[in-house]
């Protein structure tokens, strides 16, 4: 399925919504929306972001490439679209697509290609982010708010040790340093902290008060 208008339907519904909540997927698919400001291609942001009165949510079930999201936000802001904590809320329980997820995706695709069995991956690390989510070996957005806590730092060490063993053992990659990882996390926290919240409580309150909520999946 593709190019038959799923995103267009969501955009039409978003015009009359109070909230558009994306609840799963990552940035390996997207949709195109055309407004009076031109054509926008969105991979992570819900199409409701183009409507100034709509609040958008990236929910718990998503895996979020934060660098891609920042680029998407800045690109539409440069064209006059408001992106602020008041109209974009990120779940504190959403999974972070870490830098190594794309690396691992690309390395595995290359390995399989040599054997004639490549999947045709987008190389954006979505499958690996979800895999680590269910193995409890990655971070959630809420962890960015607690980087100075010993518990979070211990978790970072545990996750990094496991990932370095995978990348070194399977793909002969040089290990990543803890300091570089912590610095990357701090950069993401500085940018995204104002947007991170308990979106479950936000949506429950909105539902109870009669707000119109549209749920958007990865493909529409």
Where are these regions (language model features)?
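Non-transmembrane, aqueous-exposed alpha-helical and coiled segments at domain scale
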Residues: 1-220
């Amino acid at each position: 399925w593709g190019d038959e208008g799923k995103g267009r339907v969501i955009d039409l519904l978003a015009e009359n919504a109070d909230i558009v909540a994306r609840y799963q997927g990552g940035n390996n698919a997207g949709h195109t929306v055309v407004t009076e400001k031109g054509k926008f291609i969105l991979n992570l942001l819900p199409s409701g972001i183009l409507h100034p009165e709509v609040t958008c949510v990236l929910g718990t079930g998503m895996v979020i490439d934060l660098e891609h999201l920042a680029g998407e936000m800045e690109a539409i802001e440069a064209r006059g679209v408001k992106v602020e904590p008041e109209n974009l809320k990120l779940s504190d329980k959403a999974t972070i697509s870490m830098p190594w997820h794309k690396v691992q995706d690309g390395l595995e695709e290359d390995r399989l290609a040599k054997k004639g069995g490549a999947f045709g991956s987008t190389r954006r690390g979505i499958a690996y982010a979800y895999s680590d989510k269910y193995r409890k070996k990655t971070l959630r957005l809420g962890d960015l708010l607690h980087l100075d806590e010993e518990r979070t730092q211990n978790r970072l060490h545990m996750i990094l040790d496991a990932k370095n063993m995978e990348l070194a053992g399977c793909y002969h990659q040089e290990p990543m340093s803890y300091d570089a990882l912590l610095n990357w996390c701090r950069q993401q926290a500085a940018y995204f902290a104002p947007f991170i919240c308990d979106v479950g409580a936000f949506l429950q309150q909105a539902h109870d008060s009669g707000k119109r909520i549209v749920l958007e999946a990865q493909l529409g």
